[in-house]
Amino acid sequence: KFHWGTDSGDGFENSIYGPYLLNDARTGVHADYDRFVLEFEPDISEPDGSPDSFHVFWADGTPLSMGSGNPISVTGNNALEVFVLGYGYSRDELAEPSQAPQSLSPTRTGNLKQAVWDGEFEGVLHWVLGVKEKVDFRVLSIPNPPRLVVDVCRTSSG
């Protein structure tokens, strides 16, 4: 059973797994909610691990870029900020960037209008979700492969 609310709480304090390398980002549509998924490369030393260090909350005003402090513009009337411990670049010698999309503009979702990746700053990934209506959401951390899922209600009634 999962709790729907307006703040995920701060998951950074109790980290067990990760950080993981971002592999993909995508959106999905369900009957009562829109879904945003961050998928990470599995960690062979922790095969059942999942991203457990995150903080998701409604932005108070215009979201700001972690590194520069510049405003981040998204489509929608409200912004939901997603911070998760993770890497945007491999930790190999060549430091290859993640192949995940930088921006998503779903067309079938009811409330979620856009997702923009601000990048990685000091091992923290920052995404901003532009939504039409400020509603309840839930956050799920799922293993195999490691994923962080943000489900945003389609309307305030559910």
Role assignments for model-derived ranges:
Residues 1-158:
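Short linear recognition/processing motifs and adjacent strand/loop elements at protein termini
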